[in-house]
């Protein structure tokens, strides 16, 4: 939210098309499962003994389906492995992949409503950072469907596999030691709170591409502090740009 406001307040910013697209980690992963390996990646990266129900939700299983699978898996010596085996059975796997494609259809519709790119365009995905998990999940989907190229631009970007191919950070591994960058990520949650808006994260989209959001966890005091900080930031930008004879 704040990076967009900051950019729009700069002189000459109106020359560049800017759009607010709502894609969360959850929706990016939900739309990215196009093969068995994609489902395996979700299971191997996120499934633990204690979070099988949330993983079932990420795999777009219904609560009833997840309860049945977890119930069967819990009787096995290693429930997490049994859960994965159940999910990867042909019938359930087909459901997951089909639902993910439907989810991707709705996410893509939302994206097109906000951005409306043409084939061959380069779209900059701008965020605070730091690992680029949303970009990693959703960029291949959008690139394949729309014929565009998605590049990430972050305030803070860590050294992740292949980072130099499609992302760059104002504070990034090309300029700073990765140990220093990882130290800064310890405080990224505070920066995220100052940069966001009092709105729940998107959890799905309607058939028309409208975002459906979860509940917001922030309270009135937190919202007031954040609003004051953002107003001060924009005021600083307005004052600072007056010192330039031409836009930086």
Predicted regions and their residues:
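Long, low-complexity, Lys/Arg-enriched
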Residues: 1-248
